[in-house]
């Protein structure tokens, strides 16, 4: 890739294979990125983007991580690899001082041993023996860049998905590495967060950082990149400037989502005939929820102190306030709102994972207070924002079938599991290890585990994250099919185009309150 400046990072990958005996996952691939430049690596699910990013970032070092035939070059030092025992070894810690990395799973970059956002940001600086005065200044500056100043005292475990991604980006840039690689950094961010991240990327590039963004979607700052590389099946399908590739054959960018392409492929969903004429499948009446000073959920019957905004006067945080919501069979409702608004918290009330401080949750007309979560889960299927939280079996088929034999018997369990895998396009992956699937397929697999039970209520937390165009079409078809069969669907999303297309109505959650959008 030609640049006017010498590259700060380069790679020539003749072949990269994992130790599982399979074929090459990357091959015939050359990458070079110069200081003060922005490169976008684009591709559909399974194209090799994440593998390339982890290899360049030192998170998948040749040798322990797999066999590389080719070279890696960083800040003028080239390491040659022949795929044998004589190859050099990369020290991930040393490499990481030069290359900041934000993985697709934002939580993986955190130390997990720090109790606040501020301490997590400072962790890398502490390891580099930065003085306290400089450390405090760097934490404040980085928090300001990423909209985290009001969250510096919060425990990372209580962050929303978008807030967690902002924190991961902050941890990667606070030490000012010359190279920054981010895998799907815009996932889970609200519109304001995406704009702020775009401004941050522009500022880093202007300051001389080499930025590489891996993405299955093109929008915003990626259109300003110096170069696009399009991957398919682990090799370069095309490369060039954004203008040149967008003006070329549509086949080059097939499957890569572009906002200008419009919303989802299914068109606007028809209003279900049952809406307003049947009893709600899900109903929330006056639901409020918050946390006590010690970070634990406030118990039912807890008396709130006088509120100031979204917080009580004694620092007990209120997340949901007086929520009234009814969703009928066959209805699709989208919930939007800024990061940290409480959208995931709202969904976790549907099956009793969280209990309201005040108010009532009814599923199919029955108050679920006091009912075990397991019994409610038969009627309420919840897709978590992070699909790995609900994947644990050895194969995709076992994952979907888990618990079905006991509920439906062996014959019906097998039929349901096979049908659910087919509904999300994963029949061919039935015997694959879930942990080895790309993030998009993990999300679809987690969805299949929910669909197989045919719940009365389907609650989906950020279901479009990490999906390419093909994956979005699969999701869209599955959601519409579930609604057509009578499920009440509630989906939380920052993908406003998809929300407008798929949902019968869209409601916004902000400052703990719901309003029709």
Regions found by a protein language model. Give the residues of each.
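Conserved ABC ATPase "signature" region
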Residues: 134-151, 282, 412-429
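ABC ATPase C-loop
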Residues: 172-173, 450-451
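Conserved ABC ATPase signature
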Residues: 155-159, 163, 433-437
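Conserved ABC transporter NBD signature motif
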Residues: 65-83, 359-367, 376
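H-loop/switch region of ABC-family ATPase nucleotide-binding domains
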Residues: 215-216, 493-494
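Catalytic Walker B motif of ABC-type/P-loop ATPase nucleotide-binding domains
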Residues: 180-184, 458-462
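The feature captures the beta-strand-to-loop junction immediately N-terminal to the Walker
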Residues: 42-44, 336-338
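Helix-to-loop junction immediately C-terminal to a conserved catalytic motif
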Residues: 57, 351
């Amino acid at each position: 890739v030609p640049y006017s400046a010498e590259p700060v990072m380069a790679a020539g990958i003749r072949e990269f294979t994992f130790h599982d005996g399979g074929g090459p996952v990357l091959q015939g691939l050359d990458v070079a990125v110069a200081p003060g430049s922005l490169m976008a690596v684009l591709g559909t699910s399974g194209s090799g983007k994440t593998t390339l990013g982890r290899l360049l970032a030192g998170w998948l070092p040749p040798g322990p991580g797999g066999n590389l035939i080719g070279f890696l070059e960083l800040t003028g030092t080239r390491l040659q690899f022949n795929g044998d025992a004589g190859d050099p070894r990369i020290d991930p810690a040393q490499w990481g001082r030069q290359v900041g990395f934000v993985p697709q799973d934002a939580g993986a970059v955190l130390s997990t041993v720090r109790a606040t956002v501020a301490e997590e940001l400072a962790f890398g600086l502490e390891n580099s023996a930065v003085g306290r005065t400089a450390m405090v200044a760097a934490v404040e500056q980085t928090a300001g860049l990423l909209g985290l100043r009001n969250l510096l005292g919060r425990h990372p475990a209580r962050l929303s998905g978008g807030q967690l991604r902002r924190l991961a980006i902050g941890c990667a840039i606070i030490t000012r590495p010359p190279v920054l690689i981010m895998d799907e950094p815009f996932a889970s961010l609200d519109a304001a967060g995406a704009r702020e991240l775009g401004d941050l990327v522009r500022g880093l590039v202007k300051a001389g950082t080499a930025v590489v963004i891996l993405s299955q979607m093109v929008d915003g700052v990626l259109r300003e990149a110096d170069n696009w590389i399009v991957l398919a099946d682990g090799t370069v399908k095309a490369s060039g400037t954004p203008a040149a590739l967008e003006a070329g054959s549509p086949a080059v960018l097939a499957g890569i989502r572009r906002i200008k392409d419009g919303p989802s492929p299914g068109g606007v969903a028809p209003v279900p005939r049952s809406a307003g004429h049947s009893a709600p499948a899900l109903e929330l009446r006056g639901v409020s929820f918050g946390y006590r000073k010690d970070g634990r959920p406030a118990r039912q019957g807890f008396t709130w102190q006088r509120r100031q905004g979204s917080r009580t006067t004694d620092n007990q945080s209120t997340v949901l306030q007086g929520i009234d919501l009814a969703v009928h069979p066959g209805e699709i409702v989208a919930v939007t709102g800024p990061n940290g608004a409480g959208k995931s918290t709202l969904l976790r009330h549907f099956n009793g994972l969280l209990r309201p401080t005040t108010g009532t949750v009814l599923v199919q007309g029955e108050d679920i207070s006091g009912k075990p979560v397991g019994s409610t889960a038969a009627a309420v299927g919840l897709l978590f924002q992070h699909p790995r939280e609900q994947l644990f079996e050895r194969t995709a088929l076992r994952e979907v079938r888990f618990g079905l034999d006991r509920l439906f018997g062996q014959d019906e369990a097998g039929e349901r599991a096979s049908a659910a895998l087919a509904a999300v396009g994963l029949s061919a992956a039935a015997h694959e290890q879930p942990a080895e699937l790309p993030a998009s397929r993990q999300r679809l697999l987690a969805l299949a585990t929910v669909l197989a039970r045919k719940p009365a209520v389907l609650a989906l937390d950020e279901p479009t994250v990490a999906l390419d165009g093909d994956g979005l079409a699969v999701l869209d078809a599955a959601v519409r099919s579930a609604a057509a069969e009578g499920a009440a669907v509630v989906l939380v999303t920052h993908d406003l185009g998809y929300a407008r297309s798929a949902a019968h109505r869209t409601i916004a959650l902000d400052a703990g309150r719901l309003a029709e959008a």
